[in-house]
């Protein structure tokens, strides 16, 4: 495996969205994971809430209900890394071949290195690479190792609407 360069300059990079989420008045969380991921929900208060655009788009949309506004739960690239690693998602397949969205903090070690190797081999520079590199460093510092293997449905963030428990 290749050595990963440590990214030391995160505070000087342009700020961008990592997670596009809102919480409705009844506590339900809507999460738009990618550009055309339109999510709508009828809240207990009778109002409909929606979210669209994921974190990648310059123009995202969400509900504007002045009588009962949704709470923004968006996370940006200048948030603490502890928060980013919980909400930065990557699409992949589970052991049954179903698409799942896995948070950075749950990606196995081989997957982290594989994404960086793939991007380098394809000549792709992703603004998210620096967070994958930071996750690798974070795991070294905290002695975290996630065994390589196939993901299960439980590993992913598969629902885009999370009901308050």
Annotate each PLM feature.
Residues 122-165:
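Charge-dense polyanion-binding interfaces
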Residues 1-8:
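Short acidic, low-complexity intrinsically disordered linear motifs used
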Residues 10, 21, 97, 114, ...:
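Short, flexible coil/linker elements and helix-boundary hinge sites characteristic
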Residues 86-129:
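Amphipathic alpha-helical packing elements
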Residues 74-85, 156, 162:
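Extended terminal accessory/targeting regions
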Residues 25, 44, 51-52, 89, ...:
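Intrinsically disordered, low-complexity segments enriched in small/polar residues
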Residues 30, 49, 56-57, 94, ...:
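Polar low-complexity intrinsically disordered regions enriched in Ser/Thr and small residues
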Residues 9-81:
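N-terminal accessory interaction module
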């Amino acid at each position: 495996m290749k050595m990963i360069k440590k990214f030391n300059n995160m505070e000087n990079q342009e700020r961008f969205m990592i997670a596009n989420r809102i919480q409705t008045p009844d506590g339900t969380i809507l999460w738009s994971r990618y550009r055309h991921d339109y999510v709508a929900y009828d809240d207990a208060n009778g109002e409909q809430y929606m979210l669209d655009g994921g974190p990648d788009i310059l123009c995202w949309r969400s509900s504007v209900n002045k009588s009962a506004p949704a709470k923004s739960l968006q996370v940006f690239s200048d948030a603490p890394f502890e928060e980013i690693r919980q909400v930065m998602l990557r699409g992949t397949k589970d052991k049954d071949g179903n698409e799942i969205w896995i948070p950075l903090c749950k990606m196995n070690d081989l997957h982290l290195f594989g994404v960086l190797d793939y991007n380098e081999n394809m000549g792709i520079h992703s603004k998210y690479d620096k967070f994958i590199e930071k996750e690798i460093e974070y795991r070294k510092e905290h002695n975290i190792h996630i065994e390589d293997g196939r993901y299960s449905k439980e590993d992913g963030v598969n629902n885009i609407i999370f009901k308050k428990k």
